[in-house]
Amino acid sequence: MKVLGKELLDNLLGDAKASPRRRAHLNLHKTFDDKVQRLFIALSKGSYVEPHYHELPHQWEMFVVINGVIRVTVYNSDGSKLKELLVGDGEECRAIEFQPFDIHSVECISDDALMLEVKEGAFDPDFAKVLLTSG
């Protein structure tokens, strides 16, 4: 049994604040070969994950926001915005799931945020994500 307590998660939030990317990850799975990849992602205000998508057929992913608020933007293939929504504390949406090829970005808009990401493995770093590039 794994117990993931407040101190561990507070430390992860501290790591995010100290990081140049303003985010930190804690993998809960044992290896990249595990069939289910689970990780906590701590974000500090201003952390921005650029528009990207996952190209392999098994690369769906789900974010469950535990605390804080993130802005999720979904894009067309030409880079135009399709939808923008707030996910987390005080919002109608608390979790979001993306399918392969869903182009999306994530930005932390609260002082900090903590989310659980769940996705199918295995994880191959060579196919982690494809950044949306402007023409």
What is each stretch, according to the model?
Residues 1-37, 84-89:
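A short, N-terminal "cap"/entry segment at the start of jelly-roll beta-barrel domains
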Residues 3, 80, 105-135:
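Double-stranded beta-helix
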Residues 40-41, 59-65, 96, 106:
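His/acidic/aromatic-lined binding-pocket segments of jelly-roll/cupin-type domains
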Residues 40-59:
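Conserved short histidine dyad/triad with adjacent acidic residue
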Residues 51, 72-74, 96-98, 104-109, ...:
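Short beta-strand His + acidic residue motifs that chelate non-heme Fe in jelly-roll/DSBH
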Residues 58-78:
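Glycine- and acidic-residue-biased ligand/ion/polar-headgroup-sensing regions
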Residues 62, 76-104:
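Short acidic-glycine-tyrosine-enriched beta hairpin
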